[in-house]
Amino acid sequence: MGQVYETLAPWTEALLRAAVGLALVPHGLRNTFGFFRDTGVRAHNIAELAAQLDRDGYRPGRLWAPLISLLQLAGGPMLALGLFTRPVAAAILVFLIVTNVERWRVGGYFWNQLGLEYTLMWTIAVVYFLVHGGGVYSLDHLWLGREY
């Protein structure tokens, strides 16, 4: 079985990287362009996101809202493709740490109470790519010849 695991490991790593990165995109589409309106959030464009961030104490919201949108809409696909994996993972990690603190403040641990359970799982996955890089099947490896 060792050979099977060795063969599958780079593919499963790439699949996890793609899932983690692409999971950010719908959030960016919702917060930036108003897609997926019936998903329980109050922000459906940059201005509403900025106002929400201000209300939640993350000031200035007009600074953070476009950065969050950029991270979700550009950083997510970059992580998915393994492009500048470690720097992008570091930026996403900062965002997710703040998200986890907010989720803990609002709902504790359990996701059905709006807690951090779900976002914590994504945070741990991002830490993996911060530490390990994009892997063999990444644009970093293809273009740079190494994991970045």
Residue ranges and their predicted role:
Residues 1-44, 48-55, 59-70, 74, ...:
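Extended, low-polarity transmembrane helix blocks
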